[in-house]
């Protein structure tokens, strides 16, 4: 696995200085711009394009808290596993997922905009709490628990997307 933190010369940490990240991204992209390689041979152009792709992938990873966390876990455990394929062992959270999906379905059927707004706020609050817990687990090097929080965040991200879709459908009416 390519270390996205190393590409931008940043410390491996959950909290990333986004302004510094953007600044370094612009510098790297400027240095790798195709115009700089017009007179270069095909191999040099291909290498520059590959590096540019690596920079873009690293940026995507560092901007997304789930991907960033998974990168930290992989770098520290040496396991480049597909964390998305792990199923959560937290039965209480599995039950909560079912309840949330049912609640969202009921809100959509009843077309209750106030209930949807309240539900969205609760999901946002839960997401913030899990992000905080994830950061703590990463700081304590509890990689397995951190991976479980990544799974929870992935679900909450999908749920937030579904809430947005329901919101769009309600406002179309």
Predicted features along the sequence, with ranges:
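C-terminal accessory/regulatory regions appended to core domains
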Residues: 1-173
């Amino acid at each position: 696995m390519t270390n996205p933190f190393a590409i931008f010369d940043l410390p491996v940490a959950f909290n990333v200085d986004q302004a510094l990240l953007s600044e370094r991204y612009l510098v790297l992209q400027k240095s790798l711009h195709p115009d700089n390689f017009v007179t270069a041979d095909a191999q040099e152009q291909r290498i520059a394009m590959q590096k540019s792709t690596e920079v873009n992938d690293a940026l995507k990873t560092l901007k997304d808290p789930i991907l960033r966390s998974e990168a930290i876990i992989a770098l520290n455990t040496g396991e480049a596993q597909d964390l998305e394929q792990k199923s959560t062992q937290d039965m209480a959270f599995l039950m909560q997922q079912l309840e949330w999906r049912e609640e969202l379905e009921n809100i959509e059927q009843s077309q209750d905009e106030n209930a949807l707004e309240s539900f969205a706020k609760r999901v946002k609050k839960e997401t913030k709490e899990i992000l905080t817990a994830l950061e703590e687990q990463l700081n304590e090097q509890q990689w397995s628990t951190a991976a479980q929080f990544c799974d929870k965040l992935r679900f909450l991200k999908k749920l937030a997307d579904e809430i947005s879709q329901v919101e769009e459908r309600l406002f179309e009416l």
